Amino acid sequence: MDVIKQAIVDWLREILVGGIISNLSGLYDSTNTRVAEIAGQVGTTPAAWNSSIYNMIRSLSDNVILPIAGVVLAFVMTLELIQLIVDRNNMHDVDTWMFFKWIFKTACAVLIVTNTWNIVMGVFDLAQSVVNSAAGVTITQASLDISSIVTDLESRLMDMELGPLFGLWFQTLFVGVCMWALSICIFIVVYGRMVEIYLVTSVAPVPMATMMNREWGQTGQNYLRSLLALGFQAFMILVCVAIYAALIGNITVSDDISYAIWTCMGYTVLLCFTLFKSSSLAKSIFHAH
């Protein structure tokens, strides 16, 4: 009877150990893949990231938004002229320099609107150069491997009782689902930022048309700050990955399999949290809202 009981226990142990090893073997693959893509994704300009989307957005900006920007420009510069006249005591203290000043500001406004796309892309080219320079300094190769953290994994599992094995099997199953969810979160942050960039750049001529007006100029200035925040968010993301790489690189070899699994997951949750915070942090630095 004891022989049969032991045979059943050994059979269940082999099944649980096989299931745990199977769960652990690909536990961090999806997350490692997403993390490895981050440096390349955030270091790419809108033109290089997806040429078809870029061309579509530029076409919309030039053919749909630019005429609207022309109307906005005419309105704000007319408003500027009226304000200049009112400030000069309703033409009683008028001088010719006032009109030269208005003509100069209008010419600058037209120059800004007609070169909006070059200005916007210049911001992201600047951000790309910063990210590429930082990528050469920071550690961005971050890969989790449970076998490097827990030595002699299979032999340790075979020495465990059925109860702890069943609990560990359930933990690996749960952590596996969580790691898939975290990899999706990383995907959302990285790709969502690029979609946001395309959305913001598509309407660029309208806020840029307000730049030279005293009252409406804050719209254009805040738009530029938003562009800088989006551009330098890539730098923040790269720093997050570098910190994550340093943290997992310092994970010590552990005898506790459960502790090792949850530690790796904890660092990945921390990475996702900081990636989501990178947008608000960049906007607060540049006072964009």
Residue ranges and their predicted role:
Residues V72-C108, V203-G217:
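Hydrophobic transmembrane alpha-helix segments characteristic of membrane transport
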Residues M1, K5-I8, L12-N23, V94-I112, ...:
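Alpha-helical transmembrane segments and their helix-start/interface "positive-inside/aromatic belt" motifs
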Residues L60-V64, D95-F99, I103, L165, ...:
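Hydrophobic, aromatic-rich alpha-helical transmembrane segments
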Residues L16, I20, L24, T106-V203, ...:
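Non-cytosolic segments of integral membrane proteins
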Residues M1-V3, K283-H289:
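Long, low-complexity, intrinsically disordered extramembrane tails
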Residues V35-I65, I85, N89, A109, ...:
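Internal transmembrane helix-loop-helix hairpins in multi-pass membrane proteins, together
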